């Protein structure tokens, strides 16, 4: 028998699915999965940087400068048919050397939009998109 609740297992399966999808589709803004353990509900990924939260605390960055990059990777995930649904500064990772952005923590990722958007990040990237539509 397992010591995990059904909900924990569902969240783990959800997250594992996204990491495996990213590996299969070679999605560059999701860290590569290195290993996983279904019994212990552990997923190991390549270390690609630090959270945007830690980066901005430590390096003193302007979050607004990163909105276009966050919008790009968020919209790419949506194009694959999934909403992150937990988009927060701690779930956006940045490589401090080249400022490449990644998304992590896919427990709540779903084909339906259900983000509580507690940090207003989805609202910010959506608002900036509408006001700066580019003609193609």
Label the predicted regions:
Residues 87-94:
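Hydrophobic residue at the +6 position relative to the catalytic HRD Asp in the kinase catalytic loop
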Residues 73-77:
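Conserved hydrophobic alpha-helix
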Residues 49, 89, 108-110:
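Short, glycine/acidic-enriched loop or turn micro-motifs at the edges of active sites
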Residues 1-3, 35, 46-47, 105-106:
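Residue-level recognition of conserved beta-strand positions in structured domain cores
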Residues 1-16, 20:
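ATP-binding glycine-rich loop module of kinase domains
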Residues 66, 79-83, 95-136:
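C-lobe/activation-segment region of protein kinase-like
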Residues 8, 23, 29-66:
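Conserved structural core of kinase catalytic domains
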């Amino acid at each position: 028998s397992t010591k995990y609740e059904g909900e924990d297992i569902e969240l783990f399966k959800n997250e594992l699915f996204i990491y495996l999808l990213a590996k299969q589709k070679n999605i560059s803004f999701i860290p590569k999965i290195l290993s996983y353990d279904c019994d212990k509900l552990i997923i190991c990924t390549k270390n690609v940087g630090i959270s945007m939260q830690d980066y901005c605390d430590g390096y003193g960055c302007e979050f607004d400068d990163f909105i276009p990059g966050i919008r790009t990777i968020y919209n790419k995930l949506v194009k694959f048919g999934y909403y992150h649904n937990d988009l927060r500064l701690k779930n956006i990772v940045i490589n401090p050397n080249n400022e490449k952005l990644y998304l992590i923590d896919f427990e709540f990722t779903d084909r339906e939009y259900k983000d509580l958007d507690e940090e207003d990040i989805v609202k910010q990237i959506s608002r900036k998109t509408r006001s700066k539509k580019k003609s193609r």
